């Protein structure tokens, strides 16, 4: 039992963080439940599963009352707008496809939220993420490891965690299957036991990110041209933010064969279209790299790397090319390597590290 160890847990009102809070209480921790009030416009307050809608706050409050822990709502709207929403908008305007959940974990949940917890004397922060943290006694390093089920594993979104953060973070449901988590919630009489998983970007209604960016951007969205790989004009596009690498449907123009978005050039406002085989590349450059299982990359290292949340890790070799920049060379070409997405590297179930894809080669 961990009597007198104080932990502040982020509660979204969903089943995962609710059960995580319950498990911590059962283990003897002094648990404080907190819902983070993030930025949301009036028209998206009640997104189904939205993590800071009024209903989500009330769900979290009811769970906290049921398991007998204090509950608070903390306002992170300003920093969330600056570090997540503005970043999200800027990246799309640059022809990239960002992952706002990774930015939120890096800047909000495991930075500002973490600092707030430490300021009030908490020993740990906790979340309902599906991942595990272990200490390697031989090296003294804290390791981030995949959860027991690959289907729900969320290590991809947590690669920015530092050694200090890992030391003071608890992930109570990393050893549980999702079905078991729901069972525990039902056994405890939690109304959230059958609450649907959130599937959308929490601040974007109906997942319509393009119109969200258009509405909130100070920059005018300009039409431009589709071009082929040789630069020949094929037609007009309605603005680069409406397209992503690998896209085939919704181009608004028809050809005699399937055509795919293979590159987006914000400088001259063009979108390059090509064949499916043009999407396959073996190399990429990643920046803002954070390593977890190693301190620095001294020499080429064999890993398994995944280029998006839903991808399977693929064998590759990583090479250092700068202070926080690496080149990844895959054994087999990867389809639709996308600027702005994260690439995360693994050694089996251990997270080696990750970074933001700058370009494919």
UniProtKB/Swiss-Prot annotation:
InterPro entries with a match to the protein in the record: MnmA-like, MnmA-like_C, MnmA-like_central, MnmA-like_central_sf, Rossmann-like_a/b/a_fold
Top-level lineage group: Bacteria
Disulfide feature: 104-202
Keyword Cytoplasm: yes
Residue ranges that the Swiss-Prot or TrEMBL entry lists as coiled coil: none
Biological processes annotated in GO: tRNA wobble position uridine thiolation
Annotated site location: Interaction with tRNA: 129, 341
Region (Interaction with tRNA): 152-154, 308-309
Enzyme class: transferase
Residues reported to bind ATP: 10-17, 36, 128
Entry's Gene Ontology molecular function annotations: ATP binding; tRNA binding; tRNA-uridine 2-sulfurtransferase activity
Catalytic activity: S-sulfanyl-L-cysteinyl-[protein] + uridine(34) in tRNA + AH2 + ATP = 2-thiouridine(34) in tRNA + L-cysteinyl-[protein] + A + AMP + diphosphate + H(+)
Catalytic residues, chain numbering: 104 (nucleophile), 202 (cysteine persulfide intermediate)
SUPFAM superfamilies from the UniProt entry: Adenine nucleotide alpha hydrolases-like (SSF52402)
Annotated EC: 2.8.1.13
Localisation per UniProt entry: Cytoplasm
Chief location of this protein within or outside the cell: cytoplasm
A Gene Ontology term for the protein's cellular component: cytoplasm
Keywords (A to Z) from UniProt: ATP-binding, Cytoplasm, Disulfide bond, Nucleotide-binding, RNA-binding, Transferase, tRNA processing, tRNA-binding
Keyword Nucleus: no
Pfam families in UniProt: tRNA_Me_trans, tRNA_Me_trans_C, tRNA_Me_trans_M
Job of this protein: Catalyzes the 2-thiolation of uridine at the wobble position (U34) of tRNA, leading to the formation of s(2)U34.
Protein family membership: Belongs to the MnmA/TRMU family.
Listed name of the protein: tRNA-specific 2-thiouridylase MnmA
Protein species of origin: Clostridioides difficile (strain 630) (Peptoclostridium difficile)
Gene: mnmA
């Amino acid at each position: 039992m961990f009597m007198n160890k104080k932990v502040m847990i982020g509660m979204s009102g969903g089943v995962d963080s609710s059960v995580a809070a319950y498990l911590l209480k059962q283990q003897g921790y002094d648990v404080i439940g907190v819902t983070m009030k993030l930025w949301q416009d009036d028209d998206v307050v009640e997104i189904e599963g939205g993590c800071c809608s009024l209903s989500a706050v009330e769900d979290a409050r009811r769970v906290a009352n049921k398991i007998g822990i204090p509950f608070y709502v903390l306002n992170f709207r300003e920093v969330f707008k600056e570090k997540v929403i503005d970043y999200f908008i800027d990246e799309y305007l640059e022809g990239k496809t960002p992952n706002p959940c990774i930015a939120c974990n890096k800047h909000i949940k495991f930075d500002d939220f973490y600092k707030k917890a430490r300021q009030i004397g908490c020993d740990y922060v906790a979340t309902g993420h599906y991942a595990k943290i272990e200490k390697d006694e031989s090296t003294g390093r804290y390791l981030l490891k995949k959860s027991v089920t690959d289907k729900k594993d969320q290590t991809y979104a947590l690669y920015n965690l530092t050694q200090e953060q890992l030391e003071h973070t608890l992930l109570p449901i990393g050893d549980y299957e999702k079905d078991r988590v729901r069972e525990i919630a039902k056994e405890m009489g939690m109304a959230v036991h059958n609450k649907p998983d959130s599937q959308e970007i929490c601040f974007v209604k109906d997942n319509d990110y393009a119109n969200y960016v258009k509405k909130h951007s100070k920059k005018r969205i300009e039409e431009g041209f589709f071009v082929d790989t040789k630069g020949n004009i094929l037609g007009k596009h309605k603005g680069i933010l409406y397209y992503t690498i690998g896209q085939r449907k919704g181009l608004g123009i028809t050809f005699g064969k399937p055509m795919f978005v293979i590159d987006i050039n914000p400088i001259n406002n063009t979108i390059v279209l090509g064949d499916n085989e043009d999407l396959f590349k073996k190399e990429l450059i990643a920046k803002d790299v954070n390593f977890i299982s190693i301190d620095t990359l001294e020499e080429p290292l064999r890993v398994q790397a995944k280029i998006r949340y839903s991808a399977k890790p693929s064998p590759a070799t990583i090479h250092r090319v700068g202070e926080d920049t690496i080149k990844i060379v895959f054994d087999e070409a990867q389809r639709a390597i996308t600027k702005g997405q994260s690439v995360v590297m693994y050694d089996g179930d251990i997270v080696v590290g990750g970074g933001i894809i700058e370009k494919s080669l």
